[in-house]
C-alpha cells in the first residue's frame, strides 16, 4: 500500500475476508496528516474505533463515509462528532429510479431464461471472493 504518499485513499471494496478491517490503526498511522479517506464500498473495511482514534489524534485531513460499521450508525456513535468528517446515507443501486428497477427486473428475467436453457447466468457473484469477476 502507498499510504504515506497518497493524498486521497478511496475505498470501493466489497465485503470479503480479504477486505475485512483492511484499514486499521496501524495503517491509518501511515497516512499523510492531510490525507483524505473516502469509503463508499463496505463499512467493515475500516476498523471504526481505530478510525475514531486516528482522527481525534490528527492523523487524517478528512474523512468521507458513505458506509459505516455498524450500519445504520447509532445516534450516539462517536463518528458523528469527529472533526472534518462527512457521513452520508448509503443508498445502493438508486432503486428509487425507474430505470434501475427495470434493469434489475430485466436481468432477473434474462437469468431465468438462461437457467431454463442451461446457459451461463449474468452477474454471478463468486462466493469465495465476494464479488463478480469480469468475464
Regions found by a protein language model. Name each.
Residues 71-135:
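C-terminal helix-to-coil terminal segments
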Residues 1-78:
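Rossmann-like adenosine-cofactor binding region
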Amino acid at each position: 500500500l502507498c499510504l504515506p504518499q497518497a493524498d486521497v485513499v478511496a475505498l470501493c471494496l466489497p465485503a470479503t475476508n480479504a477486505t475485512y478491517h483492511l484499514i486499521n490503526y496501524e495503517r491509518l498511522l501511515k497516512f499523510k496528516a492531510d490525507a483524505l479517506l473516502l469509503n463508499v464500498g463496505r463499512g467493515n473495511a475500516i476498523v471504526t474505533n481505530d478510525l475514531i482514534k486516528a482522527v481525534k489524534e490528527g492523523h487524517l485531513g478528512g474523512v468521507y463515509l458513505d458506509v459505516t460499521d455498524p450500519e445504520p450508525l447509532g445516534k450516539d456513535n462517536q463518528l458523528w462528532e469527529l472533526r472534518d468528517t462527512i457521513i452520508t446515507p448509503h443508498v445502493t443501486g438508486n432503486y428509487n429510479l425507474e430505470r434501475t428497477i427495470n434493469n434489475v427486473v430485466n436481468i432477473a428475467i434474462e437469468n431465468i431464461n438462461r437457467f431454463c436453457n442451461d446457459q451461463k447466468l449474468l452477474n454471478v457473484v463468486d462466493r469465495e471472493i465476494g464479488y463478480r469477476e469480469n468475464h
